[in-house]
Amino acid sequence: MATNWTTEDSKSLVDNYTVLDNVYFAVDGTFSALGILFNTSTIFIILKGRRFGQQIKLQLLNISLIDLICSVILPTTVALNGFTTISYPNNKSLCKAQEYVTFTLFYASLLAKTAIAIEKVVAVCFPLVILKYERTHIISVIALVWVSAILIHVNIAIDSVVLESKYFNDTLVCVPNANLIYAQYLAYQQLAIEYAIKYLTPSFIILISYGVI
């Protein structure tokens, strides 16, 4: 499928939005602002607090930093996808980079929360094991989280194509070549499949872990 690189001036895109579209942008903006506020406050509290152990402090800082960056990137992504005719016109590399960084950060956040949930189960069920859980092990877990998040979405950065989506407007989206079988169902359908495969499994582990506790 060839990408149609249009240079025509767009109409007022906001005029074409439905009420649901405007609600979507409003909700994203609200969550982004709250995310920046709460995660910045959390980082400040963790750094100043003395009641946190070294291990949990590192984990909470890691999650808060990831979520803070996500909160900053979110409004940028929404603005590019909602208020421009085409995101990154004639620049496929930037389109891929934005998509790759966004998905990597979201997945790193989820994996970090999954790691904490598993650690809590181990602490409750195997307390003697957790006593040997030193700082070096925490750093290894954090490194594993980041490496996994970086590698699992590497196909977006390397082996993907840039296609137009009719989601809100003719914004560009990056679709891994392996997923072209459903590329015609861009936006909602593609995201639903990716989230089901990549995100529901860690979420299920978190649910089971806290259920055991």
Features from the language model and the residues they span:
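Extracellular N-terminal segment of 7TM GPCRs
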Residues: M1-S41, L180
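Generic alpha-helical transmembrane segments of integral inner-membrane proteins
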Residues: A33, L37-T40, V72, A108, ...
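Loop architecture of class A 7-transmembrane GPCRs
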Residues: T6-V14, T85-T104, L151-L200
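Hydrophobic alpha-helical transmembrane segments of polytopic
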Residues: Y24, F31, I63, I138-V145
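Extracellular TM2-ECL1-early TM3 structural module of rhodopsin-like
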Residues: Y17-G29, I56-A115, F126, I130
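Transmembrane helix-loop junctions and nearby membrane-interface residues
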Residues: I43-I46, P75-T85, V121, H153-E164, ...
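Intracellular signaling interfaces of 7-transmembrane GPCRs
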Residues: K48-L58, V121-V141, G211-I213
